[in-house]
């Protein structure tokens, strides 16, 4: 009863009153009580108060498995990932067939983007319990992260079957995965499943539907069902007319229809709503993917002005400058690339039968300049 009252107080932001109430619990030093209170504070967003209660049991329960699990979960929840990994490994040494400990490890590795280790830990969790749905869900997320669409789809399906992930979320990821495989009809089918779930729940105005409508619209554009795609963008605007993603998608649709002026207007609206670097980059990429290279270069240049180290913007600009015969700008951006084009790569392009005839003069000039610069570097080292 006191835990429930404390939760209500914390919901109202009355931390001190909740702390006093919890301090009056008769069995406050019992491990079960400590566990309940620590998770209450963590769930309500009070990690410092949770730490006080965690420390309360330290001297008495240090080697107790439940207390160690609580400590590991606390460390993971407060982003002390390396320390959490140490505790989860200790717990696994004690109980190697406990899938929840393996899942704790999975989540830590996933946060660290050590995806191969996360997948391996998922496999150990499933070896302990092949019906442990959360392991399938995280394994799916890992494969999705790696752009391994086939394995992601398989694991999302299993996670949905085991009720480890909301179906609408699983279907959304499956739709995106099919889109990554360019299987647009299957992608569209799964977006329909997401929409059906929201409609069944009577939640037709959910902001989550914006992502679904725009993703479905993009899939429909590849199926050349442009009118339906634009209708979906309008439905998304009814939910939130100030969402830049809608206008980004709309711009992509217009590019697919070769309506450059309309695309430009939509992209300008997207920037007006979300003038962040990510939006500039996504618009540049949309132009690039549709072979509007002059516009792509303009938008990538804006990205570079905001942050020269953003994503692979220097790589994009170096290639575009090369294609446009802007040799000085090519060298400027190429020098800043993490993996710059080297002399041998330019020679390969020159020798390739696939290079454009109009590029030959530029490539030869770049190659000759690279040779001279490399000779100077070699002499300087002697």
Locations of regions flagged by a protein language model:
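Short coil turns that delineate tetratricopeptide repeat
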Residues: 28-30, 62, 96, 130, ...
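Start-of-helix register in tetratricopeptide repeats
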Residues: 32, 66, 100, 134, ...
């Amino acid at each position: 009863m006191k835990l429930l009252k404390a939760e209500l107080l914390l919901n109202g932001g009355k931390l001190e009153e909740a702390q006093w109430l919890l301090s009056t619990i008769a069995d406050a030093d019992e491990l079960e009580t400590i566990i309940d209170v620590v998770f209450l504070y963590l769930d309500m967003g009070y990690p410092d108060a949770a730490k006080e209660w965690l420390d309360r049991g330290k001297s008495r329960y240090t080697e107790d498995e439940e207390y160690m699990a609580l400590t590991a979960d606390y460390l993971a929840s407060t982003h002390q990932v390396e320390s959490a990994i140490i505790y989860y490994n200790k717990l696994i040494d004690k109980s190697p067939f406990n899938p929840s400990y393996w899942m704790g490890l999975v989540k830590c590795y996933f946060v660290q983007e050590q995806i191969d280790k996360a997948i391996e830990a998922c496999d150990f969790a499933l070896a302990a319990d092949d019906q442990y749905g959360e392991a399938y869900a995280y394994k799916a997320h890992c494969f999705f992260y790696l752009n391994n669409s086939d394995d992601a789809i398989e694991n999302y399906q299993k996670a949905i079957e085991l009720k480890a992930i909301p179906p609408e979320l699983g279907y959304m990821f499956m739709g995106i995965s099919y889109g990554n495989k360019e299987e647009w009809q299957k992608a569209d089918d799964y977006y329909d499943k997401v929409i059906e779930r929201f409609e069944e729940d009577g939640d037709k105005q959910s902001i989550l539907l914006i992502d679904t409508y725009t993703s479905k619209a993009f899939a429909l554009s590849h199926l050349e069902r442009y009118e339906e795609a634009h209708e979906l963008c309008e439905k998304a605007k009814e939910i939130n007319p100030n969402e830049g993603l809608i206008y980004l998608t709309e711009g992509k649709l217009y590019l697919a229809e070769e309506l450059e002026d309309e695309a430009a207007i939509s992209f300008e609206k997207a920037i007006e709503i979300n003038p962040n670097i990510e939006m500039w980059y996504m618009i540049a990429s949309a132009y690039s993917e549709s072979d509007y290279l002059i516009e792509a270069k303009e938008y990538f240049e804006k990205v570079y002005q905001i942050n020269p180290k953003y994503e692979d913007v220097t790589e994009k600009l170096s290639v575009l400058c090369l294609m446009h015969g802007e040799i000085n700008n090519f060298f400027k951006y190429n020098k800043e690339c993490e993996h710059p084009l080297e002399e041998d790569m330019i020679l390969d392009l020159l020798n390739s039968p696939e290079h454009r005839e109009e590029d030959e003069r530029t490539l030869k000039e770049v190659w000759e300049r690279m040779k001279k610069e490399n000779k100077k570097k070699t002499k300087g080292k002697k």
